[in-house]
């Protein structure tokens, strides 16, 4: 398996796991917020504000995963080393 194949697989798996965790976390956060509003409708403003801030924090995980995956794909610092090694092996 080549270096670039492994990079693509790592980026795909990393993004999948990052978004899976984000989706589960956001679902649990919204579930808890809806339960809180159903128990105390008067506090819906505070609950909504806190939930939005929490969702923004949770969403940052997906953004960080995307950035790391893009770095792995397009700005990999080991790309030159892998190309040199491939040229050496091919000779």
Curated annotation (Swiss-Prot):
Domain of life: Bacteria
Keyword terms, alphabetized: ATP synthesis, Cell inner membrane, Cell membrane, CF(0), Hydrogen ion transport, Ion transport, Lipid-binding, Membrane, Transmembrane, Transmembrane helix, Transport
Places the protein is found: Cell inner membrane
Cross-referenced CDD domains: ATP-synt_Fo_c (cd18121)
Cellular component per GO, a single term: plasma membrane
Site entry (Reversibly protonated during proton transport), positions: 59
Molecular functions per Gene Ontology: lipid binding; proton-transporting ATP synthase activity, rotational mechanism
A Pfam family matched in the record: ATP-synt_C
Signal peptide (residue range): none
Chain segments annotated as transmembrane: 4-24, 53-73
InterPro entries reported in the protein's UniProt record: ATP_synth_csu_bac/chlpt, ATP_synth_F0_csu, ATP_synth_F0_csu_DDCD_BS, ATPase_proteolipid_c-like_dom, F/V-ATP_Csub_sf
Membrane topology: Multi-pass membrane protein
Assembly and interaction partners: F-type ATPases have 2 components, F(1) - the catalytic core - and F(0) - the membrane proton channel. F(1) has five subunits: alpha(3), beta(3), gamma(1), delta(1), epsilon(1). F(0) has three main subunits: a(1), b(2) and c(10-14). The alpha and beta chains form an alternating ring which encloses part of the gamma chain. F(1) is attached to F(0) by a central stalk formed by the gamma and epsilon chains, while a peripheral stalk is formed by the delta and b chains.
Matching HAMAP family: ATP_synth_c_bact
Similarity remark: Belongs to the ATPase C chain family.
Function of the molecule: F(1)F(0) ATP synthase produces ATP from ADP in the presence of a proton or sodium gradient. F-type ATPases consist of two structural domains, F(1) containing the extramembraneous catalytic core and F(0) containing the membrane proton channel, linked together by a central stalk and a peripheral stalk. During catalysis, ATP synthesis in the catalytic domain of F(1) is coupled via a rotary mechanism of the central stalk subunits to proton translocation. Key component of the F(0) channel; it plays a direct role in translocation across the membrane. A homomeric c-ring of between 10-14 subunits forms the central stalk rotor element with the F(1) delta and epsilon subunits.
Protein name: ATP synthase subunit c
Organism of origin: Geotalea daltonii (strain DSM 22248 / JCM 15807 / FRC-32)
Upper lineage: Bacteria, Pseudomonadati, Thermodesulfobacteriota, Desulfuromonadia, Geobacterales
């Amino acid at each position: 398996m080549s270096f670039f194949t492994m990079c693509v697989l790592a980026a795909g798996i990393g993004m999948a796991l990052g978004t899976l965790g984000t989706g589960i976390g956001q679902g649990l956060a919204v579930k808890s917020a809806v339960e809180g509003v159903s128990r105390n409708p008067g506090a819906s403003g505070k609950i909504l504000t806190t939930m939005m801030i929490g969702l923004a924090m949770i969403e940052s995980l997906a953004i960080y995963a995307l950035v790391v995956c893009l770095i792995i794909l397009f700005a990999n610092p080991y790309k030159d080393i892998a190309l040199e090694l491939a040229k050496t092996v091919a000779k």
